[in-house]
Amino acid sequence: MAKRDYYQVLGVAKNASDDEIKKAYRKLAMKHHPDRNPGNKDAEEHFKEAKEAYEMLSDSQKRAAYDQYGHAGVDPNMAGAGAQGFGGFADAFGDIFGDIFGQAAAGGRGGRSGPQVYRGADLRYSMEITLEQAAHGYDTQIRVPSWVSCEICHGSGAKPGTKPETCPTCNGSGAVRMSQGFFSIQQTCPKCHGTGTYIPEPCTHCHGAGKTKETKTLEVKIPAGIDDGMRIRSAGNGEPGINGGPSGDLYVEIHIKAHAVFERDGDDLHCQMPIPFTKAALGGEIEVPTLAGRATFTVPEGTQSGKTFRLRGKGIKGLRSSIAGDLYVHVQVETPVKLTDAQRDLLQQFEKSLVEGGARHSPQSKSWFDRVKSFFD
């Protein structure tokens, strides 16, 4: 099945800003999140589709590649794409893709002999946290796959008792020259991939890679106020460099789980608050939840369903904010159910008193009936 256009998935224009893309993704994620739609396969697919679209369009490099080449520009099976989930940009045998990914440590060889030095690939790790953890900060540990020097060949990639030999194609320079008419182009040696050597008898344990994978534990400090989609950089914990090049970095991408009570909008929080119709009619103090505990505020007499109250400073203090956002409480007036006969009689007496009183006890209803009457007159 062909993939839909990422902009179409999020419902934004191709020139949409980063904020517009983020807001569109947050809205779809809230709507289709599996926690809110248990057992709903369609919602799960929509959630995955929106997540994939956001991951591509929120990254400036991936977005540029997608804008120019479409899905082919970000297909993980083609030479321009990053990894899905957790993974590097080079495979287990240390294939080098050079400047396509910006991994050359010095921007090329500059005409010098000897093997090229490459920076290790960056890795990505996706982590889900709760809204409370995002608001207050969170220290945790993660276990990630990591490359280490092969214990059998000690990193040489060669079978014990043998050693790498000088590449016969480039004579150890790591590069070859290709002539095309009047032009001479230097490019990475196709046999040794720029290392200047080749391995006639690869190590059977690491298959000539000189490294093997193991799992290591890393400490991750999630700062208070982090938002969905933000990344935390762990320097030097990506894949090891090639030929002595520096290691890449590990990027921990944060995703915030849907909350049972609150919805986040930047530094602000929103919640739906049901109140009994008697409290709405008479007014009084109500108790509402916040991320810091419980808070109280007074609803005025005659509060209507849908009324929004703002509690200043009861939201989240963002990473770049000096003060916390606000909590918006959206009141929903509840109608009582399963009435007893005595309660029903009381309500009927109450309704009768409203009609006989002649006062405008229901201003919205009165206004609506007036408009309907004028429509038919």
From Swiss-Prot:
Kindly report the protein's main subcellular placement as a broad class: cytoplasm
Q: Which GO terms describe its molecular function?
A: ATP binding; heat shock protein binding; unfolded protein binding; zinc ion binding
SMART domains named among the record's database cross-references: DnaJ
Q: Which GO terms describe its cellular component?
A: cytoplasm
**Annotated CXXCXGXG motif repeat ranges:** 150-157, 167-174, 189-196, 203-210
Which locations, inside or outside the cell, does it occupy?
Answer: Cytoplasm
Q: Where are the transmembrane segments?
A: none
Q: Which PANTHER family does the UniProt record give?
A: CHAPERONE PROTEIN DNAJ, DNAJ HOMOLOG 1, MITOCHONDRIAL-RELATED
UniProt-recorded name of the protein: Chaperone protein DnaJ
The organism's lineage is: Bacteria, Pseudomonadati, Pseudomonadota, Betaproteobacteria, Burkholderiales
Gene (UniProt): dnaJ
